[in-house]
């Protein structure tokens, strides 16, 4: 079976990493990989993960109880939901509980309108001007080009390669093309995505989740450009500590959970009607369900990546370690033979540091809580955030950037509110972004 050959490859990778770490004086690869990160060490990480587990476990238990009760109404003999069926039951629950089908909002998110909305949102939030550029030579005719300005000062150039085609990478990513050097070289970057559309007559109707992904990736691009104005290329934004790099883009996601921001561009591709508030409310409530369970799942992946890089690779039982963590963090029934670790590609790029997604979610929500919910894009927080967090790039430690914007150490308050939003019957606050 393929997973067995992947096991050999993974064991060889872990062995080589351990050898390198020990040559450099570290006990494990995880100690080496975290030494110059915000988290500092595996010991500090384990302490932090305990805090996240404490915050998310109780609401995750409530989510699972509701989901199991719903499933048992349809299958009375069911005692535990299988890991293989979990996503199915979650989708059925959202449809029944919130009367929301993810397909119902797609007509309000044609690709061209979403692109305009993303650009307009970033422009207003960061006090910049993003202007289309014509006549630029690109690697494919479908690629569009924009220059980013601060007043009359050009900050950099971005390329959007947004639709699938033969031979193209199938993922969604941000690619820095040129690092900025103040006074000598402007930063350039590209989004390489696979969103619907791109063909004549195809409006490219997008799922809401795709709309959020677009803004997330655009957040990386803005970090690269705005943070690429420093004296040295090594101070570019993406050279900040690796366990901070997802925080700015995850923070930006939250703006597209606001009705005022969405309604500024979410118009029906045929009638031009604005996304109905009632449909948004159902979508928003459905979106809150499963957050805590999702965070427990992130803890599972974090624990696996950490254990794989701290336990001796020669005797490491991949299935046993994965199953032990699965049973610790997942309420679902384990499926023997799933071998998820054998296709866990983050073990290659992130190695022991998958925790980045968990840490940065907490920081991102703390950041977002500093914005006025009644005027998300128009208040002073956007420019202050740009100057304190994005513009410095890697000239300062990430922890200092966080403190400079928050005025304090980060905490879990906003994260806890985010986890519990599904149990809050209060109506959703909307900004005046329109």
Put a short name on every predicted segment.
Residues 29, 196-198, 227:
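Short connector loops/turns at beta-strand edges and beta->alpha or beta->beta junctions
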Residues 41-42, 169, 199-203, 233:
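Short small-residue beta-strand/loop micro-motif enriched in glycine and branched aliphatics
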Residues 14-16, 206-207, 396-398:
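Short hydrophobic "helix-edge" motifs at membrane interfaces and signal-peptide entry regions
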Residues 110, 196-215:
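Short pre-active-site segment immediately N-terminal to the catalytic Zn-binding motif
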Residues 95, 113, 117-130, 138-140, ...:
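C-terminal, non-catalytic "cap/extension" segments appended to globular domains
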Residues 11, 15-16, 20-194, 254-303, ...:
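Active-site-proximal, well-structured secondary-structure segments within enzyme catalytic domains
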């Amino acid at each position: 079976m393929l997973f067995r050959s992947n096991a050999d490859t993974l064991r060889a990778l872990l062995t080589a990493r351990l050898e390198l770490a020990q040559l450099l004086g570290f006990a494990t690869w995880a100690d080496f990989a975290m030494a110059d990160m915000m988290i500092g060490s595996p010991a500090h990480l384990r302490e932090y993960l305990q805090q996240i587990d404490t915050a998310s476990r109780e609401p995750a238990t409530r989510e699972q109880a509701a989901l199991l009760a719903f499933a048992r109404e349809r299958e009375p003999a069911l005692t535990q939901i299988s890991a293989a069926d979990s996503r199915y039951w979650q989708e059925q629950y959202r449809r029944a509980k919130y009367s929301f089908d993810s397909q119902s909002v797609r007509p309000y998110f044609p690709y061209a309108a979403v692109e305009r909305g993303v650009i307009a949102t970033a422009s207003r939030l960061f006090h910049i001007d993003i202007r289309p550029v014509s006549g630029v030579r690109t690697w494919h005719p479908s690629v569009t080009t924009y220059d980013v300005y601060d007043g009359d000062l050009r900050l950099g150039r971005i390329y959007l390669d947004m639709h699938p085609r033969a031979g193209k990478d199938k993922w969604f990513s941000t690619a820095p093309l040129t690092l900025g050097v103040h006074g000598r070289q402007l930063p350039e970057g590209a989004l390489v995505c696979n969103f619907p559309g791109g063909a004549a007559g195809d409006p490219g109707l997008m799922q809401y989740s795709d709309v959020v992904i677009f803004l997330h990736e655009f957040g990386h691009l803005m970090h690269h450009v705005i943070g690429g104005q420093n004296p040295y290329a090594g101070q570019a934004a993406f050279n900040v500590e690796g366990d901070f790099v997802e925080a700015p883009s995850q923070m930006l996601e939250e703006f597209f959970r606001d009705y005022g921001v969405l309604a500024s561009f979410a118009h029906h591709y045929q009638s031009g009607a604005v996304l109905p508030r009632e449909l948004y409310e159902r979508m928003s409530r459905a979106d809150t369900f499963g957050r805590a369970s999702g965070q427990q799942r992130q803890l599972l992946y974090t624990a696996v990546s950490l254990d794989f890089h701290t336990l001796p690779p020669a005797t490491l039982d991949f299935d046993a370690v994965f199953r032990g963590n699965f049973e610790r963090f997942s309420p679902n029934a384990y499926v023997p033979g799933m071998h998820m670790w054998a296709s866990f590609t983050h073990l290659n790029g992130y190695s022991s540091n998958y925790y980045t997604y968990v840490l940065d979610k907490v920081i991102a929500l703390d950041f977002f809580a500093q914005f006025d919910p009644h005027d998300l894009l128009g208040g002073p927080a956007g420019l202050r955030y740009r100057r304190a967090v994005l513009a410095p790039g890697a000239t300062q430690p990430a922890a200092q950037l966080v403190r400079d914007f928050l005025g304090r150490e980060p905490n879990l308050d906003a994260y806890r509110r985010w986890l519990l939003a599904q149990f809050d019957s209060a109506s959703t606050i909307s900004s005046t972004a329109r």
